[in-house]
Amino acid sequence: MLIPTSGTANILGQSIENKPEDIRKKIGYLPSEVNYYDGMSSRELLEYHAGFYENVNTEKIESLSTLFELDLERKIEELSFGNKKKCAIIQSVLHNPEILILDEPTSGLDPLMQNRFFELLEEENKKGTSIFFSSHILAEIQRLCNRAAIIRKGEISAVEDIQSLLEKQMKKARFIFTAQKELEFIEGVQNPVWTNNKLTFDYMGPVKDLIKWMNELDLKDAVLEEPDLETIFMNYYQ
């Protein structure tokens, strides 16, 4: 834990300048690139790590290594990048941290292990762990997080609930009628275009208002395309 050259930082209501060792015990960290000393087995490494904390149940090493199919007896230098990442995942949650900081955590994991990792995070979150998840794979953010911060050029451009971010963005809609008709558009409808009996338009506004309007119309079909988090992210960079 580095002491700031200027400014202040508080974690769990406590200044990092006061008893930083106490704060460290409450934090789990998973770096994007994992580097360990050679010569130890995965088991030795994890048991060594557990020794820095009180009341760590070492049975958790066994259960998590089974979950991630990690051979605890293999030497660190013999492990692939993906298996080193599995070891680091176990290390980050072994002491039941109150805050978990993850930097590009799924790099090196195959799809099966990624899914098991996501399930582990969901379990940890249900136990009360706050998780900070940094990733360029925005589908992961959308799946796992309830709030997102968008960072551009080292500064935070937005911090909002995921659902709020999605609702504030432009949606594309397509309505199909039995025939073209005169309509009174609700607020938020932009760029309406008729093509025979099909109306396409952009919509910016509450989804519930759009659904209410749809129910008042005699529609054959309707399609509403919600923007994904990647589209929203790119809007902040344009």
Which residue stretches match the model-derived regions?
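ABC transporter nucleotide-binding domain
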Residues: F117-Y203
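Hydrophobic anchor residue at the start of the ABC signature
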Residues: I89
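Catalytic Walker B motif of ABC-type/P-loop ATPase nucleotide-binding domains
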Residues: L100-E104, L109
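Conserved ABC nucleotide-binding domain
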Residues: S6, T58-E78
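C-terminal coupling/interaction segments
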Residues: D202-Q238
